[in-house]
Regions:
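GIY-YIG nuclease catalytic motif and its immediate N-terminal context
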Residues: 1-68, 74-84, 94-98, 115-117, ...
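C2H2-type zinc-finger recognition helix
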Residues: 90
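An amphipathic, aromatic/His-enriched active-site/gating alpha helix that lines ligand/cofactor pockets
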Residues: 95-113
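Short, surface-exposed polybasic/aromatic micro-patch for ligand or macromolecular engagement
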Residues: 87
Length: 126
């Protein structure tokens, strides 16, 4: 019963979830760039997680919902979307993910600070 309730709540919340770009503009479902590479952080900015997805709203909500309590993001409370890039091609998104994963921490922080200096959570519930 608990699992069914969790899935239902996640589904309802996802319908109302929105991702915003750095300028505060809603990144709607009409977006023609379906793939994204993204960076999540925890509240204290001590942990970074880099991922790739074909549905940024859904994927960030999955991280925030902590559906899998054994996942890296759930264990370290990494649930703040602090940076993302959109791509036309899944190959380009994966290539960027791999590139960012090889960067040192300083470079990643500089990238985030250039676009989101306050490290605001770019994901918002409507």
């Amino acid at each position: 019963m608990y699992v069914a309730t969790l899935v239902f709540i996640t589904f309802v919340t996802l319908a109302e979830a929105r991702v915003f770009n750095i300028k505060g503009e809603h990144m709607g479902s009409n977006d023609v760039t379906p793939f994204a590479t993204y960076i999540l952080s925890n509240y204290k900015k001590t942990v970074l997680y880099i991922g790739v997805t074909n549905d940024l709203n859904r994927r960030i909500l999955e991280h925030k919902s902590k559906i899998d309590p054994n996942s890296f993001t759930a264990k370290y409370n990494v649930d703040r979307l602090v940076y993302f890039e959109k791509f036309q091609s899944v190959n380009d998104a994966i290539a960027r993910e791999k590139q960012l994963k090889h960067w040192n921490r300083e470079w990643k922080e500089r990238l985030i600070n250039e676009k989101n200096p306050e490290w605001k959570d770019l994901f918002d519930y409507a």
